[in-house]
From Swiss-Prot:
Active site: 12, 62
Protein name (database record): Tritrans,polycis-undecaprenyl-diphosphate synthase (geranylgeranyl-diphosphate specific)
Pfam short name (any one): Prenyltransf
Native organism taxonomy: Archaea, Thermoproteota, Thermoprotei, Desulfurococcales, Desulfurococcaceae
Naturally occurring in which organism (per UniProt): Aeropyrum pernix (strain ATCC 700893 / DSM 11879 / JCM 9820 / NBRC 100138 / K1)
Entry keywords, A to Z: Magnesium, Metal-binding, Transferase
Length: 219
């Protein structure tokens, strides 16, 4: 088995990283955000076979149940970086696709407005998804919302690439509703490291592990 064409990343463990180091949540989430950028750049430069990267930014439960204080930290980081990060993704030859309920009442208007042009719904209105490499971000994402919001023919999970490899940091061994229709045959790689400590070498090990897997995929 060669390299995966689509990988999913569940970047878990930012809060525990803060607690273990005696840092505040802003430092933890900002460090985690910087690591997302580092890993995306590494994939772009050294893994040309990977065409899609799926990131679990926030589940719909996260958007509904996390404290206002914690969400405000996350949104503050997002507001500071959205335009610059989108420009970097596009400069690197990829397209951003947002999947999830960006009309969620807990999502700030300015973030919603900045991300709306890149939402899956906007691509549907244009008639097609962007070709080439993609960064797919799950924001206020929930599979039940997806099924209720779209027709069977326009489900994101029908039109996006199926995920070959899911990497979850932080030691938890579950998917937490991470694109369940796209992970039917995904290989699941769990690592105890907390997300801010995840390195490029850890990614290399995950991809190498994937290459050893036998994947009958129902056959």
């Amino acid at each position: 088995m060669g390299q995966p064409r689509a990988i999913g990343i569940i970047p878990d463990g930012n809060r525990r990283w803060a607690s273990l180091r005696g840092e505040n949540l802003y430092i933890a989430y900002y460090t985690g955000y910087r690591n997302v950028k580092r890993i995306l750049t590494y994939i772009r430069d050294f893994y040309p076979a990977i065409r899609s990267v799926y990131l679990y930014v926030l589940s719909r439960d996260n958007c509904s149940k996390r404290s206002r204080a914690e969400l405000s930290i996350l949104y503050r980081i997002m507001r500071r970086s959205i335009e610059r990060d989108i420009a970097e993704i596009e400069k690197g030859g990829a397209s951003l696709v947002i999947v999830g309920d960006i009309n969620h009442p807990n999502l700030p208007d300015n973030i919603r407005e900045s991300l709306a042009p890149y939402h899956f719904d906007m691509y549907l209105k244009k008639g097609s998804l962007p070709d080439g490499r993609r960064v797919v971000a799950g924001l206020c994402y929930d599979p039940f919302w997806e099924i209720e919001h779209y027709t069977p023919k326009t489900l994101p999970s029908r039109l996006l690439d199926e995920i070959d490899l899911v990497i979850r940091t932080g030691g938890e061994k579950r998917l937490s509703s991470f694109f369940p229709l796209l992970t039917r045959y995904a290989e699941l790689y769990f690592i105890d490291k907390l997300w801010p400590d995840f390195t490029r070498e850890d990614l290399d090990r995950a991809v190498q592990w994937f290459s050893t897997r036998r994947r009958p995929m129902g056959r």
